[in-house]
Amino acid sequence: MSLPRCALLWARLPAGRGAGPRAAPCSALRALVGSFPGASGRVPCLAASSSASGGSKAPNTSLFVPLTVKPQGPSADGDVGAELTRPLDKNEVKKILDKFYKRQEIQKLSADYGLDARLFHQAFISFRNYIMQSHSLDVDIHIVLNDICFSAAHVDDLFPFFLRHAKQIFPVLECKDDLRQISDLRRPPNWYPEARAIQRKIIFHSGPTNSGKTYHAIQRYLSATSGVYCGPLKLLAHEIFEKSNAAGVPCDLVTGEERLTVEPEGKQATHVSCTVEMCNVATPYEVAVIDEIQMIRDPARGWAWTRALLGLCAEEVHLCGESAAIDLVTELLYTTGEEVEVQKYERLTPISVLDRALESLDNLRPGDCIVCFSKNDIYSVSRQIEIRGLESAVIYGSLPPGTKLAQARKFNDPNDPCKILVATDAIGMGLNLSIRRIIFYSLIKPSINEKGEKELEPITTSQALQIAGRAGRFSSHFKEGEVTTMHRDDLALLKEILNRPVDPIQAAGLHPTAEQIEMFAYHLPETTLSNLIDIFVDFAQVDGQYFVCNMDDFKFSAELIQHIPLSLRVRYVFCTAPINKKQPFVCSSLLQFARQYSRNEPLTFAWLRRYIKWPLLPPKNIKDLMDLEAVHDVFDLYLWLSYRFIDMFPDSSFVRSLQKELDVIIQEGVHNITKLIKISESHKLLNLEPSGSQSRLPGASKSPARRTRGTKTGNKAAEPPSPSDKELPLASRLVQQGLLTADMLKQLQKEWLTQRPEQGKEKVGTRRKKKDPNSD
């Protein structure tokens, strides 16, 4: 052991009780090297640093996940602290630590350094475990503990060691100011220097559906020397791509899963049609068109419209959308010094809300479209229409684009016997449909609130107008549109919703970039990506015109692949891949793709064929059809990743060919969807939990029933209406709200029969009798 080290250790030996003959030399050495901070027996006064709490917003410390600091094992040099002083008595040390924990002064000082009650408790538990479980402690803390045992030091002298340990398990304490600066989102216009370097002309084309607003913007786009169209859907991007090239204007297509070039040798065309997330904000254009600008408020995707609005480098930027976005867009562009020219349009064809509901599917006429908000309602209505000897086309969100277009062509074809359309709100944009009358099967739509909880609420005015506006389109066979509801008692509510003014949009969405997350990870290297996102959102500073978009889907993917060794940038890209987290096969495919990538094993066409067990057979029931839709989504995922990691996903052209084959198989299944529903019901593979509206399909029963609002997806076959208006009001509400399923209700009924035979026999018997018509 070196002499300086010996001097330092001897200088820290206790000068009080038990020091014996070594007290004098110890005092002399302390005079040379100085005493340990805090040896005066009071709370040490440490210099404030960036780790001290500060800033305008206190962080949500529940997001700080403590790291693990392992206790020290046996040292090769032995327990030097014990050699120079004495071995520590664990019982005495525990008493000292407990006393330290209970000190109000220590808790207050900890709070000054960002350790609130929760963090203080967690840090202390870790600190205590570290000290109690270590074979040998660092010499300095060993000596201080020994000094405290002999009353030569104060218990508060442990604070520097405690704070050091707290910063080890909560590294965010060291860099809060840096993190706040990184997550400062208060000046988004400054992120786009190319756009700020020019004076853009902004034209807002405002009007309802079928007013020609997008048409006028596209005409300017086609006449420009260069242009970019940014749409919300792949279908819309494809439509403009085809229209542009048909008009003799060379146009490329860019979506997340597809790139199409029309110029020879892959040369970039003067025009490009893309989904809004894919627009290039560094490329200069003469004209840019941003469609459906009101989606800037979308909780998940709004950031893409904000980025396009503020960042597109175009001499003219044409915005198409609802008037509700005018004020916000004007305010946002005021900060860039750009003025907004507003051009308002009126609907080209009249539309009227009928005074009578449909009430019965027997009253359907050619050109009718029944809008449902769940697949189960789609299946049930389609089956009821088929029973009446009518053909219907079916469109819902999870269908592949090719299948949607095929069903739209079938419905629009005047020579096709299919004259009825059953669809979800997926028809609200992206499809040209010849609809005469929109019939709302229900006005209740499931939605996800800010807390990620499922809610059943009436559709908004904006949603109702978007869907209703599909009736009587200018380019369709029907020059006048009509709107009504399936059920009589929904009609008044529909009129009320449609007559409400659309609430002005208050804020635009923002999203952290990969670079910002990388900087966070630099400061918090041991933190998971999901936790990094939580901390970023918590630290983010935005002004009243913006909000941070919901990142639950991103976090879901991050947690799914967290255990797979990937670089942060690669992990970030995988997490931004658009997947349906409700599809187990798609989620497991993302996991498998990430695992293959981490092993540096390319995902070849042959590997993918084996993985999905190609060839796939035509669907025999609804479950088979849903499985095929999931495989189609897996192909989309592969293609999306192939444009980000070309070497690891090398066979995009083969996969695209395979996807087209699958699209044909799915189209065949959807064409025969009523047969699939019938087979599924007969084999008990499809159990449809009726919503209140579904359970009262006209013709299903002769007795009228009370309307139960809501669209509830579940696992029970469609039932005839209740025979009594007063029966089971509470149970109906609970099922409607998603708090009970039909199976749970059955079980409760059985328990009521067992536990309260006298009280429950009559009512339960009535319920059971009601379900007899559907029993096998």
Swiss-Prot record:
InterPro entries linked: DEXQc_SUV3, Helicase_C-like, P-loop_NTPase, RNA-DNA_Helicase, SUV3_C, Suv3_C_1, Suv3_DEXQc, Suv3_N
Matching Pfam families: DEXQc_Suv3 (PF22527), Helicase_C (PF00271), SUV3_C (PF12513), Suv3_C_1 (PF18147), Suv3_N (PF18114)
Source organism phylogeny: Eukaryota, Metazoa, Chordata, Craniata, Vertebrata
KW Oxidoreductase (keyword) present: no
Co-factor(s): Mg(2+); Mn(2+)
Chain segments carrying region Interaction with LAMTOR5, important for protein stability: 650-776
Subunit structure as annotated in this protein's UniProt entry: Homodimer; in free form. Component of the mitochondrial degradosome (mtEXO) complex which is a heteropentamer containing 2 copies of SUPV3L1 and 3 copies of PNPT1. As part of mitochondrial degradosome complex, interacts with GRSF1 in a RNA-dependent manner; the interaction enhances the activity of the complex. Interacts with LAMTOR5/HBXIP, WRN and BLM.
Regulation affecting activity: Helicase activity toward DNA substrate is inhibited by micromolar concentrations of 5,6-dichloro-1-(beta-D-ribofuranosyl)benzotriazole (DRBT) and 4,5,6,7-tetrabromobenzotriazole (TBBT). Helicase activity toward RNA substrate is inhibited by elevated concentrations of TBBT. Inhibited by some ring-expanded nucleoside analogs.
Presequence boundaries: 1-40
GO molecular function, one term: ATP binding
Every Helicase C-terminal domain range: 353-521
Function field: Major helicase player in mitochondrial RNA metabolism. Component of the mitochondrial degradosome (mtEXO) complex, that degrades 3' overhang double-stranded RNA with a 3'-to-5' directionality in an ATP-dependent manner. Involved in the degradation of non-coding mitochondrial transcripts (MT-ncRNA) and tRNA-like molecules. ATPase and ATP-dependent multisubstrate helicase, able to unwind double-stranded (ds) DNA and RNA, and RNA/DNA heteroduplexes in the 5'-to-3' direction.
Subcellular location per the Swiss-Prot or TrEMBL entry: Nucleus; Mitochondrion matrix; Mitochondrion matrix, Mitochondrion nucleoid
Helicase ATP-binding domain boundaries: 194-334
Catalytic activity: ATP + H2O = ADP + phosphate + H(+)
Mitochondrion listed as a keyword: yes
Protein name: ATP-dependent RNA helicase SUPV3L1, mitochondrial
Enzyme class: hydrolase
Positions bearing N6-acetyllysine: K99
Span of the signal peptide: none
EC numbers: 3.6.4.13
